[in-house]
Regions:
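Pocket-edge positions in alpha/beta enzyme catalytic cores
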Residues: 40, 73, 237, 276-279
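Alpha-helical elements of Rossmann-like donor-binding domains used by nucleotide-donor carbohydrate transfer enzymes
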Residues: 83, 87, 129, 248-251, ...
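Short, hydrophobic secondary-structure boundary micro-motifs
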Residues: 162, 260-262, 303
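Short glycine/proline- and charge-enriched loop/turn segments
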Residues: 163-175, 224-233, 269-272
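C-terminal helical subdomain
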Residues: 186, 210, 232-272, 281-286
Length: 303
């Protein structure tokens, strides 16, 4: 990592979703190498155990102690998010950092068992619900941080309040595939969620940040067919390494310099201007309200 290693996360408990490949795996390794205790959340046990082994090896190579656990959950399903939150609350005395990193692009429109479009469920509602369910634990562990992986794919997007199921979004398509407009909407939701979360938990000792990792060559698009793979192959020569993409996540987890910038959007260790869709009048409270309805939960009061 190019950022200065402050070791501020030594002994801290981190919950990291989407950590079996790409920037999530790179972040798990970097955090473990700084002495953080990392709980990796994944769907597949074998891949999760492989990721955990790499994180433990990184800690050993750095000469530090790190406890790396594996937790299993399909975050596109609300029942699984709820079960995970209960397990985390019961298993860990504290939670210092929640890193909502899991995400995906889907080439075709799919509905989950909850009746929610799958990319919206995984990329937005899962972080929203998991954060809500773990907020008491985060507050009790304060100072604590919530970090959500967003993307500049959000630029040009708007929150589709009249198209939450993505029918119109998937009808648009793009040169990179039909799923990219929808992906951009979910990543915009991450930015709006972070800003609204920061506003609602202000003064609680819990800080919220989100970031753009840059164009990273990862495997999160592996199951989307030949057209999507072709689109990604076009941009791959311009991509950065997962390690570089994870740098800002790790920095947000440990740096004291981000205090006072709660709710912010970052890229390469610097604040980044949010896309216009994130500043539309009333977008934060409105997204919060519809998200509560979609997960059937009241999150942190009405604000």
């Amino acid at each position: 990592m190019e950022a200065e290693q402050t070791r501020a996360v030594t002994g801290k408990q981190v919950l990291l979703t989407g950590a079996t490949n790409g920037i999530g795996l790179a972040a798990a390794e970097a955090l473990a190498a700084r002495g953080a205790n990392v709980a990796i959340v994944a769907r597949d046990r074998q891949r999760a155990e492989q990721a955990a082994a790499r994180a433990r090896a990184a800690a050993t190579a750095a000469g530090v102690e790190s406890v790396v656990d594996v937790l299993l959950a399909d975050l596109s399903l609300q029942s699984e998010v709820r079960r995970l939150a209960l397990e985390v609350a019961d298993r860990y005395e504290k939670l210092d950092v929640l890193a909502n990193n899991a995400g995906a692009i889907f080439a075709t429109r799919q509905l989950t068992a909850d009746g929610v479009e799958r990319s919206w469920a995984l990329n937005h509602l899962a972080p929203f619900l998991l954060t809500a369910l773990l907020m008491d634990k985060l507050r009790a562990s304060a100072p604590a941080r919530v970090i959500t992986t967003s993307s500049d794919a959000s630029r040009g997007a708007h929150i589709p309040f009249d198209d939450l199921d993505g029918e119109r979004s998937y009808g648009q398509g793009s040169r990179l595939g039909r799923g990219f407009p929808r992906y951009g909407e979910t990543k915009l939701a991450n930015i709006v969620f972070t800003a609204e979360l920061a506003r609602r938990v202000q003064g609680s000792g819990v800080s919220a940040y989100c970031f753009h990792p840059g164009l990273v060559a990862t495997g999160f698009n592996r199951n989307n067919g030949p057209l999507m793979k072709l689109g990604m192959s076009v941009v791959r020569p311009f991509s950065r390494s997962p390690r570089k993409g994870a740098e800002t996540l790790v920095w947000l987890a440990e740096s004291p310099s981000v205090l006072g910038q709660e709710g912010g959007y970052f890229f390469d260790l610097k604040p980044r201007q949010v896309p216009p869709g994130a500043t539309e009048a009333g977008v934060g409270p409105r997204l919060w309200e519809v998200s509560e309805k979609q997960v059937s939960a009241s999150a942190f009061g009405s604000g």
